[in-house]
């Protein structure tokens, strides 16, 4: 399958995850974006083959994974129309973070996985500044976010106040077990930034969950049109980012990225 088809279906799935959906009679989401993974895309499950065994053979370390197989659609949009209701529970699973899409003729396969945490992730500040470096790399060249083309944008600078706002929200989501731009106290990113002393003319936020490495989380945001647009917004000049772990430090990882343009 050509890469463009895989990218389009992943983009459509991430748009689906960005909004609250009705799934099996219940309101679900929004949930974080999925990161395209070439290893998962390269796995072909034959009859009687076990997904976990194939993942191990491909050297993909997963905390959990599932495969979806379906036939008939001739393009990505048709595929999305087929799966958004049939497989809504899997597509909206908040614990999965990586995705691989493959196709042979009109037979499609999607693998969704939760990767293990990167042993070299570092503390939240190290990881946050690594996110900044990866974001600036993305901003240094044109990007396509959904149907919108963005030109290269100036590099962002690290801001400790935005980083503190990001850490606060990541820790709150991880500790209280929710995923939303709105905190349990009702505050959103604008209030959190102000409470940490950041006076802004423009503010924005990306959140994600499940990605165990910096490269994975940034690739997930870039593969999701709304998150990608935040990354490429040329009017932002500063950024902070942080992750937090749920439970006793062994739970799901949650990421927050805050963008700002200070008042002058």
Describe the predicted segments one by one:
Residues 1-264:
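Functional surface patches built around histidine and acidic residues
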């Amino acid at each position: 399958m050509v890469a463009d088809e895989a990218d389009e279906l992943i983009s459509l799935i991430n748009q689906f995850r960005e909004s609250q959906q009705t799934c099996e009679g219940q309101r679900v989401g929004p949930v974080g974006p999925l990161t395209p993974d070439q290893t998962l895309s390269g796995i072909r499950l034959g009859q009687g083959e076990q997904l976990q065994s194939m993942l191990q053979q491909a050297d993909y370390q997963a905390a959990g994974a599932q495969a979806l197989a379906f036939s008939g659609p001739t393009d990505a949009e048709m595929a999305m129309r087929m799966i958004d209701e049939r497989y809504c529970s899997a597509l909206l699973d908040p614990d999965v973070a990586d995705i691989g899409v493959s196709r042979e003729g009109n037979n499609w396969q999607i693998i969704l996985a939760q990767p293990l945490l990167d042993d070299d992730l570092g503390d939240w500040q190290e990881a946050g500044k690594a996110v900044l470096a990866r974001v600036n790399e993305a901003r240094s060249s044109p990007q396509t976010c959904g149907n919108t083309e963005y030109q290269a944008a100036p590099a962002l600078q690290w801001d400790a106040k935005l980083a503190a706002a990001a850490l606060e929200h990541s820790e709150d989501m991880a500790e209280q077990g929710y995923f939303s731009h709105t905190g349990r106290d009702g505050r959103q990113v604008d209030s959190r930034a102000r409470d940490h002393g950041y006076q802004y003319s423009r503010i924005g936020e990306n959140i994600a969950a499940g990605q165990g490495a910096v490269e994975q989380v940034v690739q997930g945001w870039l593969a999701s049109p709304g998150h990608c647009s935040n990354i490429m917004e040329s009017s932002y000049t500063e950024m902070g980012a942080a992750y937090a772990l749920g439970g006793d430090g062994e739970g799901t990882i949650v990421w927050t990225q805050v963008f700002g343009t200070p008042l002058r």
